Amino acid sequence: MRLPDVPCLRAKQDKPLGDADSGATRCCGNAALSLCLQHSILGNLLVPLSFRDVEFAATALKGNLVETPCLFSRTLSAITGAQVYLKFENHQFTASFKERGALNKLLALTADERERGVIAASAGNHAQGLAYHAKRLVVPATIVMPRFTPNVKVQQTRDHGAEVILFGDNFDEAKAHAVEIANARGLVWVHPYDDEKIIAGQGTIALEMLAAQPQIDTLIVPIGGGGMIAGMALAARGIKPGIAIYGVEAQRFPSMYCALKGITPEFGASTIAEGIAVKEPGRITQAIVKELVNDIFLVDEGDLEESIVLLLEIEKTVVEGAGAAGLAALLKHRQHFQGKQVGLVLCGGNIDPLMLSDIIERGMVRSGRLAQITVELRDLPGSLAKVTACLAEVNANIDEVHHQRAFSHLPVQSAEVDFVLETRDHAHVEQIISALNAAGFRAKLHH
């Protein structure tokens, strides 16, 4: 699903912004670009945020966090038909881009605000980024997390020196409680995305990408609340006005997509891209996205899983669901990006090891490298040995065997055996089934 192309900063244009190679004049005229550099009037909302704020943030952040690499991917380029460049934000100390905005916000605090301390609500990357840099700057930090936040995330946040308060069954309840505490204690509320300093900090990603790979003409950026794409859009348009910018959301949480389309969203129960599972986009971020972003794509859970596995196998890098969203959109809509110079942000790498293990196994099934085959055979001594010998002849490696008699619907002298096999590809699976059937067994594939 896509949004219609939108104009940039009220400037008129003859063609959509997606024609990134069409030059700057098609995006912004000189007057509009000058406005973009000083302050932004987006729709009916005056946003006290501009390209210069991102530049100031870059100066403030320099030397205080990792300037992550932005590298060309030869293999992903061959797969997608685009020239693909990856920004490894999962290499930050807390494995997420969220550090940028959090640190920029902390550095902008007054002496009085630093002494009072900061508070945020988060179950993940925003919490750890804020807690880590608050500790470095000796700023008291309080983080409110939902009660059912995984213990590992709670402990990691505490290890960074923050006071952690567990409250509520979801993020919205935790956020409401955090705001109450902020008012009661006089703490500085740090919004995870709808804050000028947060947005400007996240925008430094685009500055680094275009400095490292100036040929990039297209950006695909994950969207949760919109802080990263809003900041990157301001930065990228300030440097390269004709650049094409696309957002991507999880299909189960299409909040920004639906807000801009004027339709009521339907949310899923969960998504593996929990880092972008936001039900309400920011007011500031929404205004910026509406004016500066070409389209928003939606990707499903299978798209995200496939991209996580591809990045692990090809780039040898671990990303969370949100970090794989950009590649998922590129793979799903590869015809839209043929021949483009595409920059993707691997925005985070905090994924539960057990979830990653499940995703890898499911990916192997989809690619035909792991198969479950049921074989019907006579329940006689030596029958199982004949099946395994047949499997060995076709180079199938047995991973698991389940021999079931009592719960089978077959006659009493027959049995079903389930084999989980390591295979090469789908063609190899078909070869195995054909070999078993030719040997007199009845074999079928479990889908």
Describe these PLM feature segments.
Residues 8, 27-28, 36:
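Cysteine-centered motifs
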Residues 13-16, 39:
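Cationic, low-complexity basic patches in intrinsically disordered or flexible, solvent-exposed regions
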